[in-house]
Amino acid sequence: MVNLTIDGRKITVKENTTIMEAAAQNGIPIPKLCYLKGINEIAACRVCVVELEGKEKLITSCNNVAKEGMVIHTNSPKVRRHRRTTVELILSQHDCECVTCSRSGNCSLQTVANDLNIIEIPFKMEIERQPWNKEFPLIRDSSKCIKCMRCVQVCEKVQSLGVWDVEGTGSRTTINVAGHRTIEEASCALCGQCITHCPVGALRARDDTEDVWDAIADPDKIVVAQVAPAVRTAWGEEFGLSDKEATVGKILDALKRMGVDYAFDTTFSADLTIMEEGTEFLHRFTAGELKERPMFTSCCPGWLRFIKSQYPHLVRQLSTAKSPQQMFGAVMKTYFAEKLGVSPEKIYTVSVMPCVAKKGEKEMELFYQEYAGHDIDAVITTRELTKMIKSAHISPDTLADIDSDRPMQDGTGAGVIFGATGGVMEAALRTAHYLLKGENPPEDAFKAVRSTGFNQNQGIQEANFQIDNVTVRTAAVSGLGNARALLDRINKGEVHYDFVEVMAC
């Protein structure tokens, strides 16, 4: 154990604890912009500096370890002056149009600047603006980038793709797509991890809300919306709703009040995916097609983009089943359009999804005899949904917990567990068991693949199951870096599975 003093308080922490962690553990927050534990500990922003007695220069708290006898000051006049100047310099190279920023009210830089009471910038503004394709699902605004390196590190260390890199030197240092490529040329999986970890509004998903509003206002369009299982757990945070209050039924009611004609829960089409995927696995497994390499799930578009660019020889091992999002669109523009007695072109399908990769997935062009075009016409994220609710002046307190429209009202519990890593695998195995045995398996028969052990097992959960004295070897993987490690082991023959689920995030 290490004994030290922070802001006059004597504290004791474990060895190898950073000063920032030691302070946080004792209720002393130190501001930061670039720090991500275990991923980005390079002290690039210099906002987390503290004063160490006996040392003239300030030190960064995020990557300096607490040592015996240290006396630290986190908010001395010297620290405040340095921290304020640092943030003012960052702001002088940052587009401070906060009102029109997607991260307004949820921005680390905005919070730090407000806490330091910065009301004017004493330095000359020098804002960099790089061109970007605004049609791409992921949008980068270079004028808001603070060069924190988070996107670079998380893409390289967590997702193993290295889409982002540093360009230039000195004051001209910036972040851009690696290898002097455009984002379309890079191997971006659209996993969204760079967006999630960006502390400002430099990275965001393309906003498609106006397309949805236009469709709602078009009298010739029948707008049909679906809500993914994962959205129900996230949308309420923006409105301060508890998990019990933030139900999918209230989302459906909000969509109806916005003007959507029909609203459904994606759990229905998730059941369709599971039936197809479970049936396909059973066929390929019993036919001996999986003796060398496993069948992979196909419902995560980030994973699909990854395997197509990084392991094209394994694409044939993917399940041929569409994702629930795409199946929903196909059903709406064929069966549902027929039931309504309208042409497929009149149906405008909207997906409410938690993932930017779904915006890329919907843009795959598909042609059928019944109709030509996209299964899904627009995808909005959870954040876009909450913005639409606010812009429609809908108070969450007034929303009713309504049911999905018929005939796609009923669904099993399989679709709900899609939101958890391992949930697709568990649902598919339960379906395969039923198709093989003619009866449902015990409730917890395949729950092992959806355990909480991913963090302890490098993002991989392995499990073997016995069905009629036959062993089925499975694995569920979370994160593309972990997926790469597993695929390399499969290619080398070090491990063998029959069925593998991969989720990009």
Question: Would you name each region that the model predicts?
Answer:
Residues 9-15:
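A short N-terminal beta-strand-loop micro-motif at the entrance of redox/enzyme domains
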Residues 8, 505:
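Residue-level signature of catalytic and energy-coupling elements of molecular machines
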Residues 46-190, 196, 200-218, 222:
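Fe-S ferredoxin-like electron-transfer domains
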Residues 12, 134, 144, 187, ...:
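Charged, low-complexity surface patches
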Residues 15-71, 75, 79, 206-504:
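Iron-sulfur-associated redox domains of electron-transfer enzymes in respiratory
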Residues 12, 147, 296:
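Conserved SAM-binding loop
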Residues 1-7:
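Eukaryote-biased recognition of intrinsically disordered, low-complexity regulatory segments
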